[in-house]
Amino acid sequence: MAEQSQLKNLTIILLLLCLSFQSLSFAAESHLTVDFYSKSCPKFLDIIRETITNKQISTPTTAAAALRLFFHDCFPNGCDASVLVSSTAFNTAERDSSINLSLPGDGFDVVIRAKTALELACPNTVSCSDIIAVAVRDLLVTVGGPYYEISLGRRDSRTSKSSLVSDLLPLPSMQISKLIDQFSSRGFSVQEMVALSGAHTIGFSHCKEFTNRVNPNNSTGYNPRFAVALKKACSNSKNDPTISVFNDVMTPNKFDNMYFQNIPKGLGLLESDHGLFSDPRTRPFVELYARDQSRFFNDFAGAMQKLSLHGVLTGRRGEIRRRCDAIN
């Protein structure tokens, strides 16, 4: 009996030790750090920087395209590069969800270019989800935006399904209460939501996203002269759905606080833009960022850091794709 008791105790101890080692291993795999690639791919940041600089110079809309792509990847189910995966005969991927069909190709292209360069320098080492996170940060800096640290060590998802994102991304016509609920469900405050909305200070929107509101004689919040200009710019949009207008008509290629200065003047492009100023829960932050660019930059940087950590995969929960557009 004594021997059986000792054997039982020894078995329990060994089991606990195994569980402890597994927990430690998982914790080590799950840890994100800013210097994650310092030994495995020491030129990681230099390669990213060179790639995005060349792309931004040749195509100035790249920063806005990559920023939108990053949000559409992270916000629904986490920063796992699932939006980069192409559809197959057996699966409709996220990028082919109706809400993602208008994502500009330059955002995808800059990530693919960076991945190609990194695979030559450090094969099977850097995840696509880390590439897009750093590329977006560096692209924003090139157009005047704030610098912020990015923790690294993400893995890429092994799945990408259109059905998993359809109702999880904000729409241009969405009411503020619905927007607040969406952001809140992912742990973002009202102020963080407004700060992230400042991403509209660069980029463009297709006419179909706002033309139903363009009428110089109605009270949709547009400056009348702006409404006339929009109506003219989008006059042929039914025949050419690719026609678009800059989100910030004053400084469209510069990351600044002009977006927030425009909204009170009736120069916000989307219904959700107007809603930020008309709703008492969000208006104080619009006014704050309109008069204080430094505060906007600080809050935007913090919100982007938080977004970059949303739902990340680490260790054995994900993979490092050989190609960003295809699961291994």
UniProtKB/Swiss-Prot annotation:
Localization per record: Secreted
Cofactor binding notes: Binds 1 heme b (iron(II)-protoporphyrin IX) group per subunit. Binds 2 calcium ions per subunit.
UniProt keyword list: Calcium, Disulfide bond, Glycoprotein, Heme, Hydrogen peroxide, Iron, Metal-binding, Oxidoreductase, Peroxidase, Secreted, Signal
Positions bound to substrate: P170
Pfam families, sorted: peroxidase (PF00141)
Signal peptide start-end: 1-27
Binding-site residues for heme b, renumbered to this chain: H200
GO biological process terms held by the UniProt record: hydrogen peroxide catabolic process; response to oxidative stress
Main location: secreted
A GO MF label: heme binding
Annotated family: Belongs to the peroxidase family. Classical plant (class III) peroxidase subfamily.
Alphabetical list of PANTHER family matching this protein: PEROXIDASE 63, PTHR31517
Protein name from the UniProt record: Peroxidase 63
Natural source organism: Arabidopsis thaliana (Mouse-ear cress)
